From Swiss-Prot:
Protein name as it appears in the record: Maintenance of mitochondrial morphology protein 1
Record GO terms (molecular function): lipid binding
Native species: Paracoccidioides lutzii (strain ATCC MYA-826 / Pb01) (Paracoccidioides brasiliensis)
Subunit structure, interactors included: Homodimer. Component of the ER-mitochondria encounter structure (ERMES) or MDM complex, composed of MMM1, MDM10, MDM12 and MDM34. A MMM1 homodimer associates with one molecule of MDM12 on each side in a pairwise head-to-tail manner, and the SMP-LTD domains of MMM1 and MDM12 generate a continuous hydrophobic tunnel for phospholipid trafficking.
Localisation: Endoplasmic reticulum membrane
Origin: domain of life: Eukaryota
Positions of the SMP-LTD domain: 151-412
Annotated Polar residues bias: 74-96, 105-118, 295-312
Name of the encoding gene: MMM1
Amino acid sequence: MAGSTSASLQTPYFPSSTQINPVRVDHTLPLPPSQPSLSFTQGLLVGQLSVVLLIGAFIKFFIFGEAPPPPSRGLSNRTSTHPRSYSINAASTDSSPRPLREKPSTSNILRPVPSSSTNTRSILRKTYYSATPTHPTPKHGRPRLYHSSHQPESLDWFNVLIAQTIAQYRQTAYILKDSPTSSILASLSETLNNPEKKPSFIDIIKVTDISLGEEFPIFSNCRVIAVEDPNSDGGRLQALMDVDLSDDNLSLAIETSLLLNYPKPFSAVLPVALAVSVVRFSGTLCISFVPGPRTSDQTMSPIPTPHDTTSEAIDDQSSDQPSPAQNPDGPKDAHANTSNTTDASSKHGIPKTSLAFSFLPDYRLDLSVRSLIGSRSRLQDVPKVAQLVEARVQSWFEERVVEPRVQVVGLPNIWPRMGRTGLRSSQEEPEAGSGSVEIPVMTSPGADGVSGGGGSGGGSGGGGGGMRGIDRGLSGREAGYEALRYRHAACGGHQNQSGRDGGRGGNEQFAMPGSMPDTVTET
């Protein structure tokens, strides 16, 4: 009994559903720290080496690396439609570049120009212009015109530039119409009344009306052709373009008298009034570049006549030399200037490129001639007078700018110079109706200065200075219309005065700087 009681006390009773999990105690100790595989010296060396490698890579790729190509302006999406082909001369030149340390002598500083640089076919090939046919047919002893297979161009941009130039000339001529020395009227009067040209039976020619026109010539259908020329390598290139001028009021009116000097001088006087207007002009303009004066003399041999020689000499004197009225010492100064120019050109001996232009013989020039003959009983629009005037104008035009005769003009020096450097203003076009507009106008060195065309804001420059600060006195639109026509009254030599031009002396001559007297019909 006692034994069973002690056994029951020692062994407690637990239900079968209850289980006691034994508690596990982790008796593991922390591991000691691991020793580094590299020493301090080795790590320092590795760090220094990495820094040196980074510096070397920076110097190689950022300092001595090739610069990226500059971005193209507006042409990033465009590709060249013509593959560029390199010539043999260019390849040989580029393959052996000149060392930089080589000291060149004075004879080999400028690299030689290939002999084919001025060849017509070489120029056309490098500019991708096909103007020479595959099998050209020669012609006996005459320059052969090769028809271009290239598409003709419209020349719209060229028409805009020419129109701006002509409009500026018209405006300048109107602004300077009151100048006694630089006016278009003075130039025309001096040319028409030249005693070496004018016959003795014609009295003083007085210009009564000048119209510089309102329209502009239109150029179109431009094409480049190759012309055979024995004096040049591979011929020469010539640009042909159609020009048309119609519905314009370009006109000139004069008054004079026919003198009957038999049996005694001034036995009878017959007043004559003429007005010539250009109704329409159309033709084909030929433009080519002449390499030098020697080549031009050989290529374009003139057919001089006594009349042509005299006319050219007079035209040169009237265009290049001032008149005796403008400069009393004109002959001496003009002769000195001419001799200096000739000496300078002969001293240098450098051939300058010139521009030669002419018209083909198939041009069309329609004129309108109005005449009034007599004092009391007047004859109006006599057909025979119109025929004589038209024939004289046609002859004057053909003797100067119709093939085979050409006009040769020296090209100006376009090398950039600081003396010709200007600054474009922020306001391109002044508003219409503004009070004064500053327009620089170059005057001849012999002029003492001219007054402004507006009347109130005219300035005078001494010693041939420019004229600035011109007060036009008209709005931009009115000045444009008034610039087209201005008259010179026949009686008393005074101008027709209006409210804007009141108080002006009519005997003042007008002229345009750079006017060409040879463009006026000769009588």
